[in-house]
Swiss-Prot record:
Subunit structure as annotated in this protein's UniProt entry: Homotetramer; dimer of dimers. Interacts with SIRT2; the interaction is enhanced by H(2)O(2) treatment. Forms a ternary complex with ALDOB and TP53; this interaction is direct. ALDOB stabilizes the complex inhibiting G6PD activity and keeping oxidative pentose phosphate metabolism in check.
EC top class, as a word: oxidoreductase
Modified residue annotations for Phosphotyrosine: 179
Keywords, sorted A to Z: Acetylation, Carbohydrate metabolism, Cytoplasm, Glucose metabolism, Membrane, NADP, Oxidoreductase, Phosphoprotein
Keyword NADP found: yes
GO molecular function: glucose-6-phosphate dehydrogenase activity; NADP binding
PANTHER family: GLUCOSE-6-PHOSPHATE 1-DEHYDROGENASE, GLUCOSE-6-PHOSPHATE 1-DEHYDROGENASE G6PD
Modified residues (N6-acetyllysine): 173
Organism: Didelphis virginiana
Name the UniProt record assigns to this protein: Glucose-6-phosphate 1-dehydrogenase
Membrane topology term: Peripheral membrane protein
Entry-annotated residues carrying Phosphothreonine: 10
Binding residues for NADP(+) 1: 38-45, 86
Length: 191
């Protein structure tokens, strides 16, 4: 039996990235946009940047520029910023980047997450400010999470391999969205 060698996290991420880019499955999936604010963050420097090639940045920039409003994209905002600017940044994210109608926006499945870097200082005022910001974030998201839990919305069944349920197309037509794609799902297990 061959000896197994432990891989570093960077090597694992590199292998996963290569596998994702192979074949058509990656290119038919949902769009994910990562917005990193504050390039000096520890996670960004140690884990994110080493796994992304310079050419990937150019492709990502070209792709993001080609998106029509990016409304269907899942968005993750990674804040590697000093705590003093969290309030202003999260308010702007809430006002301009989150769906204003999240409850009824299940069709678009727009996801907006905010991740924060560990505190830059242990000063009691800074820690208190971050606690206040997190409480504000939970004040915004808790009612939404409770609503989702109360509704216990069941997924609409649809044919395996299809674009989704016909009700989704009907809703898109009612709100004025015209699907112009040529999506055709290919079962990766039968290739």
């Amino acid at each position: 039996m061959a000896e197994q060698v432990a891989l570093s996290r960077t090597q694992v991420c590199g292998i996963l990235r290569e596998e994702l880019y192979q074949g058509d499955a990656f290119h038919q999936s949902d769009t994910h946009i990562f917005i990193i604010m504050g390039a000096s963050g520890d996670l960004a420097k140690k884990k994110i940047y080493p796994t992304i090639e310079p050419a990937s940045f150019q492709r990502l920039n070209t792709h993001m520029n080609s998106l029509h409003h990016g409304a269907q994209a899942n968005r993750l905002f990674y804040l590697a910023l000093p705590p003093i600017v969290y309030e202003a940044v999260t308010k702007n994210i809430k006002e301009t980047c989150m769906s204003q109608d999240v409850m009824q926006n299940h069709l678009l499945q727009m996801l907006c997450l905010v991740a924060m870097e560990k505190p830059a200082s242990t000063n009691s005022d800074d820690v208190r400010d971050e606690k206040d910001e997190l409480q504000e974030a939970w004040r915004i998201f808790t009612p939404l999470l409770h609503h989702i839990e109360r509704e216990k919305t069941q997924p609409i069944p649809y044919v395996y391999g299809s674009r989704g349920p016909p009700e989704a197309d009907e809703l898109m037509k009612r709100v004025g969205f015209q699907y112009e794609g040529t999506y055709k799902w290919v079962n990766p297990h039968k290739l």
